A protein has these predicted regions:
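HotDog/MaoC-like acyl-thioester-processing domains
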Residues: 1, 86-155
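Hot-dog-fold acyl-thioester-processing enzymes
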Residues: 1-86, 152-155
Length: 155
């Protein structure tokens, strides 16, 4: 992802309902959808509005897949790939149906640690600010990814 990216994310009651169902949250009856706040991890659903989201399958484009043998990876990998290590959200107010969020994602902190089996572990933080249709801050999300300098030794 580029250093900074901005996306628009319309929050709909049915989108919140489907998200709740997908995580096994049935606390809100379907009849109360229009007044129900989104669950805490819902802001990450902005990925559905990102045309360049790296996990999206695209017709005719090899995908790295999730099986034992990734379908879109050819040859010997140069690293172990990436790992989603952490996700944190700080809410100023709940995300509600009817909100239109503008999300600005940017690179946060980066740091390294040494690993015996994979060389350097490179940590990268992504910071996402979610602002509503009035420009007011609703939520700040921080995610940390880790990649390795080389594939992990299998010994």
């Amino acid at each position: 992802m580029a250093d900074e990216k901005t996306l628009t994310f319309p929050v709909e009651a049915t989108h919140i309902m489907m998200f709740r169902r997908s995580i096994g949250d049935f606390a809100v009856p379907d009849t109360g959808l229009e007044k129900a706040a989104a669950p805490p991890t819902f802001p990450r659903a902005v990925a559905q509005f990102d045309p360049d989201y790296h996990l999206r399958i695209r017709p005719g484009v090899p995908w790295f897949g999730s099986g034992k043998n990734a379908s879109g990876v050819e040859g010997k990998p140069t690293s172990s790939g990436g790992l989603h290590a952490e996700q944190h959200y700080e809410f100023i107010r709940p995300v509600m149906p009817g909100d239109v969020l503008t999300v600005t994602e940017k690179v946060g902190k980066t740091w390294e640690k040494e690993s015996k089996r994979a060389g350097k572990l490179i940590f990268t933080e992504r910071v996402s600010e979610y602002r509503d249709q009035k420009g007011e801050l609703v939520c700040i999300g921080r995610g940390v990814g880790v990649r390795t300098e080389r594939p992990v030794d299998q010994k």
